[in-house]
Amino acid sequence: MKKIDKSKPVLVTGANGYVASWLVKQLLDNGITVHAAVRNPSNEKKVAHLKELAINSKGEIKFFKSDLLEKGSYQEAMQGCELVYHTASPFTSNYKDAQKELIEPAQNGTANVLESANQIDSVKRIVVTSSCAAMYTDAIDSVNAPGGVLTEDVWNTTASLDYQPYSYSKTLAEKKAWEMQEQQNRWDLVTINPCLVLGPPLNLKQTTSESLNILKMLGGGDMKMGAPKIGIGIVDVRDVAEAHYKAGFTPEAKGRYITAAHNSDFLEMGTVLLPKYGDKYPLPKKALPKWLLKIVGPMTNKLFTRKFVSNNVNIPWNADNSKIKNELGMSFRSLKETMEDSFQIMIDQGIFK
């Protein structure tokens, strides 16, 4: 059990990221000094929104140049911090070399941050942004889990370098974090394991989250003939930020926390938008048949292999979020609110032509 002093600075790695930006906002609004570690603090396009958040808050922000793969590059930013949030990790399906672009940055980056924590005596707690991907690869894995539901006790055993390497990278990175935590006794570790994160970004034009590509497909007409009923969990980015905040400052917080609000699917993501946006945008109204996806899927998207379609389409995704509700007092936004807020900001920014 660790009580964190709010007068001390708090480090956030990858501070300009999709989730991290909302976390920085919450920290600043609570009057906390944020040490924001980013790759290039002088890139105004990527940090201006964070500076603006600080101006309108009770807290303050200091920027530090840090790189996931550069050893020791977080040590300066970590000085004086009792609490460290490690959110930086790649999330992309547009890779050529999974080992170099996903596995190594995720695993070595986590080790790099935690090794720095071992050198900095002030650190008491590290909150790592992991993922539900460290628990499952495909929706069928949740069906096959004990009781047909994912819990914090479940680890991903089906991903590999060749199949769903993003899930594999998150699994290896989180396992590395727990392994390093067990080798010392000064700082404790909490992991936040979100499912698909949606919701309005604070810096849309610079947000590279894969989640937003799904919204572009929904609103841009890619799914106007129908959507694949891929079972998936959904959570709002603002709720994920709050979960991080509570995981850092709740002394009793411990272990892993599934951060999922809704057991849903791609079709429901579209149909929940129909009442408000259905007249103006080519949103999906029906499910694409599984047999069709098995034929055309591999031709339209490299991730849509026949194996992926078999393991995900028309298969429900179920996770138990009772631990985070009971231990951290989390409640979650409705799917309607999350989807409408996400969609509206993309309309406002002219994403759908």
Each PLM stretch: what is its role?
Residues 183-187, 199-214, 247-257:
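Glycine/proline-rich active-site loop of Rossmann-fold NAD(P)-dependent oxidoreductases
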Residues 3-32:
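N-terminal Rossmann NAD(P)H-binding glycine-rich loop of SDR-like oxidoreductase domains
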Residues 41-108:
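NAD(P)H-binding glycine-rich loop region in Rossmannoid oxidoreductase-like domains
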Residues 243-306, 326, 335, 339-353:
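Mid/C-terminal beta-alpha module of Rossmann-like enzyme folds, strongest
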Residues 162-165, 199-207, 223-238:
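Glycine-rich "substrate-gating" loop/helix at the edge of Rossmann-like oxidoreductase active sites
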Residues 90, 96-166, 190:
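Conserved Rossmann-fold NAD(P)-dependent oxidoreductase catalytic core, especially the SDR/UDP-sugar
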Residues 215-257, 261-264:
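Alpha-helical substrate-binding/gating segment
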Residues 160-189:
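Active-site Tyr-X1-5-Lys
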